[in-house]
Amino acid sequence: MLKDLPYREKRMRPQIVLFGDSITEQSFKSGGWGASLADTYSRKADVLVRGYGGYNTRWALFLLHHLFPLGLAKPLAAVTVFFGANDAALKGRTSDRQHVPVEEYKENLRKIVQHVKECSPTVLVVLITPPPIDEEGRFAFARSSYGEKAMELPERTNEMAGVYARQCVELAKELGIYSIDIWSKMQEKEGWQKKFLSDGLHLTPEGNAVVSREVIRVFSEAWLSAAEMPFDFPHHSEIDGKNPGKAFQQRCL
């Protein structure tokens, strides 16, 4: 927790890292959930996007020591881990090389969480499940992109995405950390297929808004409420025009 950090680190703006696949990589686009998060924590935390389109958890393991080296200079406040959409690609279909068996997926997530915790024991880690799949939307997207060469059989199904989502939630319970079941949450809304998914997999602005709300909710339920975090430097209203240095003495000197 921030209150447990040494005084020197308290004065540094903490980091929130978004780690995941293309759904994270695209999160800083207009209307993206990462951009919304950065706006919410403006002047209070740095929101960093570490999203890698097409990646599964197996490939993500190779990035851990580069993205989360031991002995980080800046404190990690929180890390979201948002994988599974590619792991759940069906074996023997067009996205076969991205497929990771669900048992391995769960263990890979465990390794990611353990490494992040080793880097920063007080960090808030939140697992996010893969989103639901609109199979008709995926097929329509493939036809519009590849024409007659488009896949005839689905490369992802909503049923399989649900299998991976449940393992993600189960692991979070085992580790005693937070999770966000986006797969279930989105399907609570009638017409979710077109409302939340742009191509049957990736998120519309409305879909991004769901993720943003859920992440901010979980952060606030834990200990990372933006409303309760101080600005990194004084608000302009606290600065005396005749003696500006006074406002900076406690935080900056």
How would you name each of these model-derived features?
Residues V49:
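Conserved SAM-binding loop
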